[in-house]
């Protein structure tokens, strides 16, 4: 691979659900809103704003909008061939409870031009039931899963 110019880029995708719009258009992301939202989560509270900006630059960021105001976000880290990590799935608390979060996850996992991947992973402390609806399961062989935490 000569340079990052060879990086896979999917065509933009947009879909609607009532008054909500899901979009993969990077310019629509309200970065300030997303940073504030993620810093308030249990998984993002130890990040910095710069870490979040950098993570957005190196992944596929999806936005959820209600009348053009950002109310949700999801992010995919992938090689576009075999593996993807779903992360930073967040919906504004005022918008929860009306299936829009489930719809956003569905849109994120089923992007029209995303190749069929061998494996998707995610980490969640409290949303296992939501992700089971999309085929996620506890690891069949947890002894094969390892992780490393850098400080």
Task: Give names to the regions the model predicted.
Residues 3-47, 142:
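Short amphipathic alpha-helix that is part of the acyltransferase structural core
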Residues 50-90:
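A conserved beta-strand-loop-helix scaffold within acyl/acetyltransferase catalytic domains
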Residues 95-104:
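Conserved acetyl-CoA pyrophosphate-binding loop and the N-cap/start of the following alpha-helix
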Residues 114-150:
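Conserved active-site alpha-helix within GNAT-family acetyltransferase domains
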């Amino acid at each position: 691979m000569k340079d990052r110019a060879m990086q896979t880029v999917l065509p933009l995708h947009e879909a609607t659900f009532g008054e909500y719009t899901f979009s993969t258009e990077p310019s629509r992301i309200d970065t300030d809103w997303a940073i504030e939202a993620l810093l308030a989560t249990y998984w993002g509270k130890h990040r910095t704003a710069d870490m979040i900006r950098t993570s957005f630059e190196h992944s596929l960021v999806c936005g959820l909008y209600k009348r053009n105001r950002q109310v949700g976000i999801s992010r995919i880290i992938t090689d576009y061939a075999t593996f993807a990590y779903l992360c930073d799935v967040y919906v504004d608390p005022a918008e929860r409870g009306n299936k829009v979060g489930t719809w956003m996850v569905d849109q994120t996992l089923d992007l029209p031009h995303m190749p069929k991947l061998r494996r998707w992973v995610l980490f969640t402390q409290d949303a296992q039931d939501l992700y089971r609806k999309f085929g996620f399961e506890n690891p069949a062989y947890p002894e094969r899963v390892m992780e490393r935490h850098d400080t």
